[in-house]
Amino acid sequence: MRRIAVVGAGQAGLHLALGLRPDSTGAAGPSGPHELQEPYDVTVYTARTPDQVRAGRVLSTQVMYGPALALERAAGLHLWEAEAPRLTALGFSVADPQRSPGGGFAGPLDQPAQSVDLRVKTADWLELFEARGGRVEYGTVGPDDLPGIAAAHDLTVVASGHGPLAEVFARDARHSPYERPQRRLAVCYVRGTRMPDGLDGPHLRVTPVGGSKELAGEFFVMHALTLDGPCEIVLWEAVPGGPFDVWSDRPGPGEVVERTLELLRGHLPGEYELCRGMEPTDAGAALTGALTPVVRRPVAEVAPGAHVLGLGDAVVLHDPIGGQGSNSAARGAAHYLRAIAAHGGEPFDRTWMLRTFAAYWEHARHVSAFCNMLLGPPPEHVRRILSAAARHPAVAHRYANGFGDPAGFADWFMDADRADAYLAAVGAAGAAVPADGG
């Protein structure tokens, strides 16, 4: 039996590890044409036990769209289908610097999205992995531990996207346009928000704030499942130095809610009315910080002739503005799983690792480009698209469903000529663009 190590127990690492340890019915085999001939001997390395994860703070917002959820279902891993709210629409509105109402739209999702608190998912998946006979080594793993782990396994996959472990993979400057964080982030899981007009069920909505030349940031609200049931999540994407950049002292959940309401009262009074009754779900409900989007070289040599392969955030880290972190993690894990199954008994050498990542990158590069575009002031053609979406339901529908697979945005959203050709084809050409950039 071939031995595989997975270092990191997040969305990507556990999806891969569980796929390599299918249950006795075979229900959790990999999607795609290649099925596992037999389970692998898999060890997951992670710092925290399931109970410690559940007792800790939230980790992300993790809205997963239909295509990524389908990968979990195919692997028998979507355990919260009936419990998690089904997000059926993406709402988009605009607030200008004078705080006057702006244009907006709601695009229905063809396949509902869902968000499951990663504390719930990680803890449940760790327990499921051990129940299937997988081994978990609990404790901190650093770069100095990788040579020993790699020597003891046929393949070592590093799926930890933060801290020293991620740094073993060299930054790829060709695909990493940013050298510092573009947003300061604040997340809080809450209850007590109200539905806006036009959205009568669970959804995700976003309001960018700022003019055509300068953004202040974005405010998100989405429905989710947390430790004790359904909830809402609020997220600030604050441009550094702007009016929403008030999180450097890393406040707790109560203070995040208090500051959020102060910001909403002054900048988004409509959202303030919807959120004024919210309260944190628990003592670990808040997360603040910042990250720099980056693409890293996928293979690292940790000892002479010993290589490890990066997965998920370890090698392609997106800002959460595009909502693609967990979606990309699931897609990457499923791709690696198929590649491992197809490789049979051949060695997992550097050539195989590079080839495996290169095939994944053919899709991931589009996701990275999309998320990076969202971090800057919207180009003129994007402003035309969003303005048209407020008046043409077909445009709103296509935009909303594009988040399920952002590679499709390359066909229209990412290119001015293609965008204008699409708008003309659906009768939305010439849509007025508000002076405030909405």
Per-region residue spans from a language model:
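Glycine-rich FAD pyrophosphate-binding loop
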Residues: V7-A9, L18-G56
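Conserved FAD/dinucleotide-binding core of flavoprotein oxidoreductases
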Residues: G211-A286
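Short beta-strand to alpha-helix junction loop
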Residues: S60-V63, P108-D124, A159, L165-A166, ...
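C-terminal helical "tail/cap" subdomain of flavin- and related membrane-associated enzymes
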Residues: G322, R338-G438
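Central beta-strand plus flanking loop segment that forms part of the substrate or channel wall
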Residues: F169-G210
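N-terminal FAD cofactor-binding segment of flavoenzymes
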Residues: R48-A95
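Conserved mid-domain beta->alpha element of the FAD-binding
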Residues: V6, G289-S368
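Beta1/beta-strand and adjacent pyrophosphate-binding region of the FAD-binding site
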Residues: M1-A12
